[in-house]
């Protein structure tokens, strides 16, 4: 019997409890190209050595349990166990370590984000030997990523469908998010699209409530976007939220959206679940629908620095599960997001190949082997004065969404949309002429407001509005 396949049954079984590090801490291990690699921020309980804590994470998220079991002898642990292969202290933090764990590919079902997370972030996060645990990053090998469809269409296909190039796309979340009738909701959609926006959006918690059932909303929104298209000559879209209480109901809503001929639907991927999201993404590719993804509930999982899952991991998981857009923070708005960290996972969403860069929180080089990219969506507390910064930070391949920054315009919804479109076009033109938006952005907006009364009114309303709080998610 070769060492690779030797079992404990052949060597004799000894019952009892032994340290995890004796089996699962392997500092000499050389990772394989097919391994899934994980970087965990580990905070051990007092008295627990970091090697034991890292090994416990590797064990409890793969083949291990709290005691030796005789059935270990019926398989090859060397083939299937996770391995903690490196540990390093976290600079500036007491009793925190980054534990690197390698998982053999055979531990995971092909094409299943659900199974991947059930293993890697399952019971181990409640393990008593750990005071706190955070999954900072994952390296998804090409051998595994190729088992996923990924985004239904991707960035280039979306631009071709919309016939829009050379600038960020503009959107707006309809407000108030709850309480409008379907007809009034459709009216707001029409006014925003007619004013110059590319998209309008259901808020994440708009599903099918008593004040507005989903079918009525879909019908009035479809009417609104077709009317706006006819008047502007531009292709328009509204993110029709298909999220529902069951997968069957979700698919029924997506089918109805396709029958209406609209270009895009929406899903809340964390509250809806990865299984539902992947099913919807497959339907969208097969039926020509774009898929907008909202990350509602993400901050419950990712906001604490020492416990949970970093959003860069949730972003990678979404690219695998499938989505053409995902909300990714704004850096400058009301929602959490530090610049370097945000741009790190924005690149992980959009690019084919991303080098390891710890200055941006990227722990591993990631090769997506031509999986379609995802457009990051900047949304939350942004207005026309933010347009230069947003254009400079996110670049062309992004969606900039102004909810209150459109519907809060003193002259109404359509003028609010006009103000945002004028501001965006002015920023793109200035950038293309070689001007520095980071330094000259405010002047670019002031110049444009001289010939756009809608923009001038918006500038006056929001000139003092800032959200200057310290970010929690910093390196």
Swiss-Prot record:
Residues 1-2 form a propeptide. The keyword Calcium does not apply. This is Ribulose bisphosphate carboxylase large chain. The gene is rbcL. Coiled coil: none annotated. The keyword RNA-binding does not apply. It comes from Amborella trichopoda. Heterohexadecamer of 8 large chains and 8 small chains; disulfide-linked. The disulfide link is formed within the large subunit homodimers. One of its GO terms (biological process) is photorespiration. Its cofactor is Mg(2+). The lineage of its organism: Eukaryota, Viridiplantae, Streptophyta, Embryophyta, Tracheophyta. PROSITE patterns: RUBISCO_LARGE. The record marks 334 as: Transition state stabilizer. GO terms for cellular component: chloroplast. Its main location: plastid.
